[in-house]
Every structure is written in C-alpha cells, then in structure tokens.
Amino acid sequence: MKYLNLLILCLIVNLSFGQTSNWQKWQPIEKSHSLRIKTTKAEYYSLDLKGLKNQISNAPEAKDRDVIAPILSLPMPGGKMIDFNVISSSALAPGLASKYSEIKSYIIKAINDERVQGRIDVTYQGFHAMIQKGADLVFIDPALDKNTINYIVYKKTDLVRTNNFACLVNDESEKESLNFDSNDIRVSDNNFRTYRIAISCTGEYAQFHGGTKEMVVSAMNTTINRVNFVYEHDFAVRFEIVDKNDTLIYLNPSTDPYDNNDVGTQLDENQNQCDEKIGSANYDIGHIFSTGGGGLAGYAVVCKNNRKAGGGTGSGSPVNDAFDIDYVAHEIGHQMSGSHTQNNNCNRDDSASFEPGSASTIMGYAGICAPDVQQHSDAYFHGHNILEMGNYIVNGTGNSCPSKTILPGTKPVINTTSGNHIIPKLTPFEMEASATSEYPLLYWWDQYDNEVAEVQPPLPSNKLGPLFRSYDAVPSGIRTFPKIEYIVNNSLNTWESLSAVARDINFVVTVREDITDGARHSQAFDKLTVDANKGPFLVNNPNDKNVT
C-alpha cells in the first residue's frame, strides 16, 4: 500500500475488456514524483492484473490457427481503447517456463487493423506491452517499483533519456563477406530460426529488479520478448531463454563473479560461466546484463564456441525501451554481425556509416553522439544491417546452430527498375518500388552512401556521405525526398538535404512481409545522379501552403 499512497487518484473510469463482460477496470491516476519511467507526456492507469491473466490464459499458439484467440482491450495515448487478438509466444524454454509458470509472453494483433501489433507479457513484475501503431511505438509499463497495479502508457517519442550509453565492438576482423551480387541478394530464405540464448546478470542488476530469481527472470523475459518483436519482423529470428538460465542469475553483488562496471572483463567471465553452468552445446548466444559499464559485444560470434557468450549490456536503469531496444537489441545485433551505421565520428564503422548524424535505427547511436537525429532508436534495422546480418544468418556461421522451421509461401519478389536516374540540383524527388507476395508488404528506402560526410547535419554542398535519414517501413513503395509536408510548406528538414552539387546518390529498398511471427524480406538497389548544371526545379505559381 505504501506505493499506492504515492499516487493521487484523480479520475475513475470503468472500461470493459473483451466482448462479453466488464469485469476488468482501468483507472487513470495522477502522475507521481516517484515514477520508474520518465516521460514528457503520458497517461496513468490501474489494472486488475488477475482478471487480465484469467482473460488471456487460454491464448492459442501461432501454430494453432483454428483456435479462437481471446480478445484484450488496451489503452492507447489519448485514451482510446483498441481490441487485440492474443496469441501465446513464450520467450522461455519449456523447462524454464514450467519452473516460472507465472511468466507468460504473447503476440497481439489489433482486430480492426492487423498492422497495429506488438508484444505483451505477464510476469512476477506485472504487465508490459509494446505496440507498433503506424509510426508510433506505444508502451505500457509498471509505473512504480514492486507494484503490479499502477501503469504508465506512453509513446516512445515522449520517453526522456536518463543516462548516457557507450557501445564498443570487439574484433571486427570477424566480418564475413557478403556472398551475393547486386542482382541476386539472398539474405532471407524460407526458414524461421530460433536461437537459444543464455542470459547472466550481475548482482547489481538482480537487486535493481527485486533481488529474487522470479523477479530477475521476469525482467529478462520482458526484454527478450521485446527484442523478439524486432528480430522476428526483420530477420524471421527469435531468441528463447535456455533451460537452467536461472543458474546464471547472481543475486548478491558481493559474491557474483563479475565487475559490474567493467563490461570488458564481464565478457570473458561470462563465456566461462555460460559454458560451465549451461554447457557449450546447450546455447547458441550468451549475453550479460548489468547496471553499469555500457555495452560491448564480439562481432559475429553467434554459433561460435568459446566466443558466443561475448556480449553485454549495462545501464543504470535497465528497464523499458531505452534498455531493451536501444541497447540490448543493438548489442545482440553486433553478435549477429551488425555494424554501427552512424556517420558521426563516435565509434563510426567506415564500411557501414550510411546514416547521417547519430543515426535513427537500432545499430546507430541515437541520442548519444551529437548531432542527434533523435533521442532514441526506431525499432528496426537499416537496410545495410538487413543485408549484412541476413547474410550471416542465412549464408554464414549464424546458420550453423539455430533450430529451423519452414515458413509457408515464398519471400517477396521486387519488381523495380534500377538505373541511373538524373535529376536537377535542389529538386525534390521520389523513389518507387513494387513487389508481389501472398502477404501484405511494407517498404523502406535507405540511402546507401557510406563515405564520411563533410558536414553533419548534412548540407546541400556535401559531396560525400548520407544526405537522408532513414524512416520506418510503410505500405507504399514510394518515398518522397524530403517528406511531402516539407515540400508543401516550403520548409527544410534538417536530416533530409537535397543536393546542390554534382554527385551520385545510391539507395537500397527493403521489402518485408507485414506479419508478426516470422517475416521475410527482399532488397534491391537503385541510384540517381544530380546534375548541378540544371535546376532547381521550382513551382512558382501557385505558391500557397494551402494548395495541394
């Protein structure tokens, strides 16, 4: 009750969940000074957790397509409720799931719009949700420590960055060559891959999460459930926390084998601990969580004995999207052969620096290396990471250890005309692609020029490097450069700069199936040339922002 006393109830609203009863209530509550997650804007609710658990207890697995899924209503920013179908999708291996039977994870899909989808989990720490709703990523998390009643609902864009983070990469000499040519990109196939992940932790991480194995396994489950949301979408890959993983959980900072603040020494010790406690043959990738030390990971180490546990993530506040996506998904990305994509000089990888500034996708440095495109990473990978990580997963060492199941149908086929398109200087333009598939498709265009840019944010005079930031996938294969609202309003977008000089601008388009449980993708390249002796092409009349 002491946690409830921190809150002042300001409004009670009865809302029904599901289609047949109103037995579950959410109650908006006033903001508290002791909130676990800091935002600039949010809404607050209380939840009948027991009722919610009962409501979704019979959720079918994805393979049981003939079983009717339960319906769950969840609050969105602005107060709207959305109904979702709920499908069971455990992030724990069967033995671990049986031992910690209160920990459950699910896929959710909106009934009226299957593009609104995400992940939820119910654990000893309460309820968590991560929902992709168009361009918005929405979260529902416990508002207070050790409290499963009160919750915060917020958009990722409203999350306040509370600490700095540094990421290092061990031994990039392990990069495996991309064995394809530009006309035949085979970095996605018809397999859904499951990697067994062993996660250890320092005593400090355990104490942050309540100091019991039940609470720590719960926290690890929430993180991996959210990481799976991204990796299943972009690579048809999921991670399953191994049986006996609780033997890697250390509750006492004084007696654990790790230095909480030195992620470098953690990796060597973590390799020893995972091999000793789990057995090298019983896991495919290992990782350690801490509350300090930043992030460090071996490059392309998944499936490699004596190296595969070489990944770690530390944060003073190891919760919510900043930890799960910005940090953990990023460090695991290195272990899966993902490179830094930011063009800034903070740990830049010259072979992969395709994004302006600090970048905005997972393998960039969003919010931690000025000038920043934005404060947090968007929950997807840049086209180059899709290329190199997909190659490692499908054609490289990363294909040697996961279990595989065959996906129905075939991957998308892109129907696009590539070539050298010529445009006048300082002239907006569109890139267009189309593809065929038996499933709905999503498209995203990324610039594919990795030279070190002369100036960041990019200027029209830049002759090298990226001019255009990445944006998340949309149902249309057309992207306008810059975004159409900037063109209509005669305004500038800091991170989308038209060129005023003669140069080539290269692009990669990624097309992905719009499904939650194992999406495949295809990619193609295109290029345009800027003619500095012509243009700019202008619309002089009418020149009114109200004209469309």
Residue ranges and their predicted role:
Residues G18-I37, I149-A297:
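Fold-level signature of zinc-dependent metallopeptidase catalytic domains
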Residues Q19-D141, T265-D268:
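N-terminal prosegments of processed precursors
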Residues E240, W444-V501:
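Exoplasmic/lumenal beta-rich domain surfaces
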Residues V242-T265, C303-A379, E451-V455:
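The catalytic-center signature of Zn2+-dependent metalloproteases
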Residues T436-D446:
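Solvent-exposed loop segments of extracellular immunoglobulin-like
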Residues V511-A519:
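Short, solvent-exposed loop/turn segments at the edges of extracellular beta-sandwich modules
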